[in-house]
């Protein structure tokens, strides 16, 4: 049983370390706003993971995969949201002026808004359900009891929270924030282009 938990932990940490919408959202929020705002986003992302992992654990992902119209709707909806996030970042990057003072800090978003953005960013990537469905199908067979199943679920949640806490803390360091202030326009533009790219990829790959 210990090997099962270690295997799932290794698979999930590799998946977490692969840069995606969640990573870029947390890092961009931490470096441009604050660690507190980024952590609220992390909590939102973690709640999103709870939803996807819970659906996979209960086997509901099989229903979604069989209902082609629902799967397409989720993919297109998620893609459009990521495109919208990318548009907002690109628009903000174009409006930024080359000033040394950290002007964006005056207009910090509400914590609830960062939480919601983190949650929606994660839920906007329906490929997560394919990932979690694969994990539970491969490693959680009929011989694995209910307690162990929910133990793996808890492991995934804790691991997600821990990883993105590290990301938020790293990108909120003063050195990182000073570097961001010098290159804010380019960093936000790059992040916006990535989000738009993720969104377009979801839509065309449905």
From Swiss-Prot:
Pfam family, one: LysE
Domain of life: Bacteria
Protein name per UniProt: Threonine efflux protein
Key word Ligase present: no
Swiss-Prot/TrEMBL GO biological process terms: amino acid transport; threonine transport
Annotated InterPro entries: Homoserine/Threonine_efflux (IPR004778), LeuE-type (IPR001123)
Membrane-spanning ranges: 1-21, 44-64, 67-87, 150-173
Originating organism: Escherichia coli (strain K12)
Family per record: Belongs to the Rht family.
Single GO term (MF): amino acid transmembrane transporter activity
Cytoplasmic side: 65-66, 174-206
Residues in the Periplasmic compartment per record: 22-43, 88-149
Gene responsible for this protein: rhtC
NCBIfam families (alphabetical): 2A76, PRK10229.1
Compartment(s): Cell inner membrane
One CC-aspect GO term: plasma membrane
Membrane topology: Multi-pass membrane protein
Functional description taken from the UniProt entry: Conducts the efflux of threonine.
Alphabetic keyword roster: Cell inner membrane, Cell membrane, Membrane, Transmembrane, Transmembrane helix, Transport
């Amino acid at each position: 049983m210990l090997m099962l938990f270690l295997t799932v932990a290794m698979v999930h940490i590799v998946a977490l370390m692969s840069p995606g919408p969640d990573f870029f959202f947390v890092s961009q929020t931490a470096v441009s706003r604050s660690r507190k705002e980024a952590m609220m986003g992390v909590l939102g992302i973690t709640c999103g993971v709870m939803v996807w992992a819970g659906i996979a654990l209960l086997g509901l992902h099989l229903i979604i995969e069989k209902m082609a119209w629902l799967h397409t709707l989720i993919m297109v909806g998620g893609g459009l949201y990521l495109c919208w996030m990318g548009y907002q970042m690109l628009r903000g990057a174009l409006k930024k002026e080359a000033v040394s003072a950290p002007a964006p800090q005056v207009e910090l978003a509400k914590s609830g808004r960062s939480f919601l953005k983190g949650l929606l960013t994660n839920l906007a990537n329906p490929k997560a359900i394919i990932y979690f469905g694969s994990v539970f199908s491969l490693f959680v067979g009929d011989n694995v009891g209910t307690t162990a199943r929910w133990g793996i679920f808890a492991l995934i949640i804790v691991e997600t929270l821990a990883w993105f806490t590290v990301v938020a803390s790293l990108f909120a360091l003063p050195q990182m924030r000073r570097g961001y202030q010098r290159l804010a326009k380019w960093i936000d533009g790059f992040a916006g282009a990535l989000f738009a790219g993720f969104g377009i990829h979801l839509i065309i790959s449905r």
